[in-house]
Amino acid sequence: MACDPLTRAQILIEALPYIQQYQGRVIVIKYGGAAMVHQERRAEVLRDIVFLACVGIRPVLVHGGGPEINSWLQKLDIPFKFVDGLRVTDAATMEVVEMVLVGKVNKQIVQLISLAGGSAVGLCGRDGNLIRARSQGRAEIGFVGEVSSINPQLVQTLLEGGQIPVISSVAADETGQAYNINADTVAGELAASLGAEKLILLTDTPGILRDPEDPSSLITLLDIETARQLIQTGVVRGGMIPKVQCCIRALAQGVRAAHILDGGSPHSLLLELLTDAGVGTKLIPSQFSAQLREQSNGFR
């Protein structure tokens, strides 16, 4: 439903201090998985990212594409399976992963950003020696890697030139062997290396829930210590564990805040960043938790 002009003006005024606070700051956004399935919602998310860039914020987008990979593996009659939530990646699967993420999904995102009036450059970890990968050392999962090192210079250059870097989570080791790396992990490590203001994980859940069956049990703010306790007590479980661990690691390396929210909810990114209430879960370093909780008007 359309709102009246006065309400629109009030919305803009509410967003103003957040825009001023984050202007010129880097925000790393991870987008992928089920949250990318619906084409209209995907285009909307990318328009929101273009909006952030237009008001002076410096977004960096890291993407996955699991459903798209599954679809192409099925088309090519290549069987696939997962172990402990990780895609078993043999040589044939790795070839498809790189083809889909780097050659298809990445370029689709760049094109949608262009159609929304933004300017983006598509990359993978191989480009400009951006990401050096290494094996996880588990033979049963094949070419599933982890981040060995990041050279953020190329991304910094693109940001300074007003571009939106769009990065797929494929990288190679020192021999040139390609690896499939978890996109959450890449986003977290990249956020740390860039000294980002925020790490945003767009998922298919509202955030961290005390009860996974009850969306109203959303935890809106927690610090590193509390997040670790929630993992230990089983409140955070399943696929949410690596996401929370990724946020904890990024915060420990200097990222000021991390957010987990539903990428499929309309304009969730803008609502989380530019409104007082937010819509997801915000994680903060422990040393800031007491101070921030006392600030009723603190920035998201």
Swiss-Prot record:
Key word Amino-acid biosynthesis present in the record?
yes
According to its UniProt record, the EC number is 2.7.2.8
The record's principal subcellular location, in a coarse class, is cytoplasm
Q: GO biological process: any one?
A: arginine biosynthetic process via ornithine
Pathway given for this chain reads: Amino-acid biosynthesis; L-arginine biosynthesis; N(2)-acetyl-L-ornithine from L-glutamate: step 2/4
State the reactions this protein catalyses.
N-acetyl-L-glutamate + ATP = N-acetyl-L-glutamyl 5-phosphate + ADP
| Marked site: Transition state stabilizer | K30, K243
- One MF term in the entry's GO annotations: ATP binding
InterPro entries linked: AceGlu_kinase-like_sf, AcgluKinase_fam, ArgB, Asp/Glu/Uridylate_kinase, Glu/AcGlu_kinase, NAGK-C
Protein keywords: Amino-acid biosynthesis, Arginine biosynthesis, ATP-binding, Cytoplasm, Kinase, Nucleotide-binding, Transferase
Residues holding substrate = G65, G66, R87, N180
**Localization annotation:** Cytoplasm
Q: List cellular component terms (GO).
A: cytoplasm
What biological function has been recorded for the protein in this entry? Catalyzes the ATP-dependent phosphorylation of N-acetyl-L-glutamate.
Family according to the record: Belongs to the acetylglutamate kinase family. ArgB subfamily.
Question: PANTHER family from the entry?
Answer: N-ACETYLGLUTAMATE SYNTHASE, N-ACETYLGLUTAMATE SYNTHASE, MITOCHONDRIAL
**What is the protein's name according to its record?**
Acetylglutamate kinase
| Upper classification of the organism | Bacteria, Bacillati, Cyanobacteriota, Cyanophyceae, Synechococcales
